[in-house]
Amino acid sequence: MGNFGRVPVGIVGASGYGGVQLVRLLMDHPEIELVYLGGESSVGKSFASLYPHLAHAVKLSIEEVDPEVIARRCEVVFLSMPNGLACQIVPTLLEKGCKVLDLSADYRFRNLTTYTTWYGVERSDRTTADTAIYGLPELYRDRISEAQLVGCPGSYPTASLLALSPLLKQGLIVPETAIVDAKSGTSGGGREAKTYLLLAEADNSLAPYSVVRHRHTPEIEQICSDLAGHEVTVQFTPHLVPIVRGILATVYATLRDPGLVGDDLTTIYTAFYRNSPWVKVCESGIYPQTKWAAGSNLCYIGVEVDPRTGRVIVMSVIDNLIKGQAGQAIQCLNIMMGWDETLGLPKMGFYP
C-alpha cells in the first residue's frame, strides 16, 4: 500500500554510487515514495544484498528496465545509467507523461554533434534532446521549473561553473584566459573495479588524468559560452586525489579591471548567489575545503585577487556525489514540483 499523497518515484541504475545516494536521500524525502529500482547487471537481487547497511530501510529489489512498466508505476524517474543508455528509454518515458531527471551526459548538450564527438554515441532522439533543460538550478531555475526532462550536470562542471558564472555573466574576466584546475575523490570513478582506483594505486598519490581530453570540458565550455554571449574555450585539467568524497575546482582568469580587489569580488559573488540557498560564499580571506561540503548539498566558494598578476582565483568545493550528482538532481526535482528547493536535502556536512 503506497503512502497517500506522496509522489511515486523510480531509479534506473540504483546499484552505483550515484544510485545509492539517490536511494538514501529519497528515502528521507517527505514528499516522495520510492517504488521502483531498475538495473541490468543486478536484476533480481535485493537492494540490501548490494548495500547491506540499508537493509533495515530499503526492501526493494532490482527489476528489469522496462519503460512501459516504469511509466505505469512512477510519476518521476531518475536515470543513473552509463552514458548512451538513457537516450534509449527517455522518449518513451516522456511520451507516457513521466518527469525525467538524467544523471548521465545524454541530455546535457544542446548540440548533439558535440556529444557524439566526445562520447562516441550516435543519436536519433534530437527532438527529445531539444526539450532538455540543463539542471544547474543556480543558473536555470526558471527553466527547470517548467521542464519535463532535465539533464543533470556532471560533478566537475557543477563546481567549475558555480565558480565561473558571476565572472562571465558580469563580464569581469577575459573569458579565454580561464583555467580550471580540479581535484576529485575516488568515488567519482564509480563502483566498478578499476586498477587506478585501488587503494594501493590511489593512496599517497595525486594524479592528473584525461589531460586536454576530459569529457566534461565541452560541457563547461557550453555553459561558459552561454553566459559570456560568445564561444568560450576553457583549459580544464582534472586530478585524482586520495579522498573518497569531494571536488575542489580552482579557477584562474585575468580580470578586465585590474583595480578590483578580493573584497570587491566577494561582494559580487555574495550578491550573485543571494537567492541560491545551496551556495555559500566565504568571507574575504577564507578559503573552502572539501571536508566542509562532504555529505551535504552545499557548494562553498572562496574568492581572491592577485594584484601582481591581475588574476582572480576562485575556489569552489562540493561533494561530488551530492551537489555534484544525486543531491543536485533532487534539488532540480524540488523545483520542477514547486516544492522548497531545500526539501529533503542535507544542509550540513559530516565534519570532521
Swiss-Prot record:
Signal peptide: none
Pathway participation: Amino-acid biosynthesis; L-arginine biosynthesis; N(2)-acetyl-L-ornithine from L-glutamate: step 3/4
Gene Ontology MF term list: N-acetyl-gamma-glutamyl-phosphate reductase activity; NAD binding; NADP+ binding
GO CC annotation: cytoplasm
Location of the protein in the cell: Cytoplasm
Catalytic activity line of the entry: N-acetyl-L-glutamate 5-semialdehyde + phosphate + NADP(+) = N-acetyl-L-glutamyl 5-phosphate + NADPH + H(+)
Keyword terms, alphabetized: Amino-acid biosynthesis, Arginine biosynthesis, Cytoplasm, NADP, Oxidoreductase
EC number in record: 1.2.1.38
UniProt GO BP: L-arginine biosynthetic process
Matching NCBIfam families: argC
Cited PANTHER family: N-ACETYL-GAMMA-GLUTAMYL-PHOSPHATE REDUCTASE, CHLOROPLASTIC-RELATED, N-ACETYL-GAMMA-GLUTAMYL-PHOSPHATE REDUCTASE, CHLOROPLASTIC-RELATED-RELATED
Entry similarity comment: Belongs to the NAGSA dehydrogenase family. Type 1 subfamily.
Its biological purpose: Catalyzes the NADPH-dependent reduction of N-acetyl-5-glutamyl phosphate to yield N-acetyl-L-glutamate 5-semialdehyde.
Protein name: N-acetyl-gamma-glutamyl-phosphate reductase 1
Upper lineage: Bacteria, Bacillati, Cyanobacteriota, Cyanophyceae, Nostocales
Gene name of this polypeptide: argC1
